[in-house]
From Swiss-Prot:
Keyword set includes Protein transport: no
Gene: lolD
Gene Ontology molecular functions: ATP binding; ATP hydrolysis activity; transmembrane transporter activity
Classification via InterPro entries: AAA+_ATPase, ABC_transporter-like_ATP-bd, ABC_transpr_LolD-like, LolD_lipo_ATP-bd, MacB-like_ATP-bd, P-loop_NTPase
Gene Ontology cellular component list: plasma membrane
Protein name: Lipoprotein-releasing system ATP-binding protein LolD
EC number: 7.6.2.-
Biological role: Part of the ABC transporter complex LolCDE involved in the translocation of mature outer membrane-directed lipoproteins, from the inner membrane to the periplasmic chaperone, LolA. Responsible for the formation of the LolA-lipoprotein complex in an ATP-dependent manner.
ABC transporter domain segment(s): 14-239
GO biological process, one term: protein localization to outer membrane
UniProt keyword annotations, A-Z: ATP-binding, Cell inner membrane, Cell membrane, Membrane, Nucleotide-binding, Translocase, Transport
Quaternary structure and partners: The complex is composed of two ATP-binding proteins (LolD) and two transmembrane proteins (LolC and LolE).
Subcellular location, record wording: Cell inner membrane
Binding-site positions, ATP: G50, A51, S52, G53, A54, G55, K56, S57
Length: 239
């Protein structure tokens, strides 16, 4: 296991054991990594860094149940993902995880409010509850005055703040971010990053962020480097 601050099995919001992924095309086999162990505690913030093509996004997809590992297990909120049906995995993701990507993936035909309401509606809550939770989150990310605007009417930073609100609206145990500030200018990226840290502190939501920005990575609790198929924790001086 990695890191002195890492949670024990009972307290982990996400846990991976001996995780491996190999891509197959015909007779060709391309191993990405094998035997990775990782545990993320409640409220902990973790950066994953590494060279392009190292498998960082693949690891994030496996942790989020968006892809199936070749070997090993992923546990989310104590539940083994491989033991769940596709439908059960989808419900667990919606309830326990939030996702923020480099590109916002907002639905263009819906307003900011409707986009943020969507995860709550998918969890089975009624419209009034979904609207209330979405309005509260949009206000907290500084978009209370833009709730009726569609993504095309928002700036890049506003769209990403809306995506952060959508990721957090169901109060997930962990948010997984794949270069969430990578498509923004430095000033806007800093604003969005600060927002994610503020919400992490306020809600005790864990963060696992893939980033190429070492200056941002240094501000998280732990920095893990994926290198040649192995995951290692970096000392602060090495980040």
């Amino acid at each position: 296991m990695l890191g002195k601050t890492q949670a024990d099995q009972g307290a982990a919001v996400i846990r991976a054991e001996r995780l491996g992924k190999t891509y197959a095309e015909g007779k060709m086999r391309t191993p990405v990594f094998d035997g990775l162990d990782l545990s993320v505690a409640t409220g902990e913030t973790v950066a994953i860094v590494g060279a392009s093509g190292a498998g960082k996004s693949t690891l994030l997809h496996l942790l989020g149940g968006l892809d199936i590992p070749t070997s090993g297990e992923v546990y989310v909120a104590g539940r083994r993902m491989s033991a769940l049906s596709d439908g059960e995995r989808g419900k667990l993701r919606n309830r326990s995880l939030g996702f923020v990507y480099q590109f916002h993936h907002l639905l263009p035909e819906f307003t900011a409010l409707e986009n943020v309401m969507m995860p709550v509606l998918l969890s089975g809550q009624d419209v009034s509850i979904a609207r209330g939770q979405a309005l509260q989150l949009l206000e907290s990310v500084g978009l209370g005055h833009r709730v009726e605007h569609k993504p095309s009417e928002l700036s890049g930073g506003e769209r990403q703040r809306c995506a952060v609100a959508r990721a957090l609206v169901n109060k997930p145990g962990c948010v997984l971010g794949d270069e969430p500030t990578g498509n923004l200018d430095d000033k806007t990226a800093g604003t969005v990053f600060e927002l994610m840290l503020e919400l992490n502190r306020a809600q005790r939501t864990s963060l696992v962020l893939v980033t190429h920005d070492r200056s941002l990575a240094r501000r998280l609790d732990r920095v893990l480097e994926l290198h040649q198929g192995k995951l290692r924790e970096l000392a602060p001086s090495a980040v």
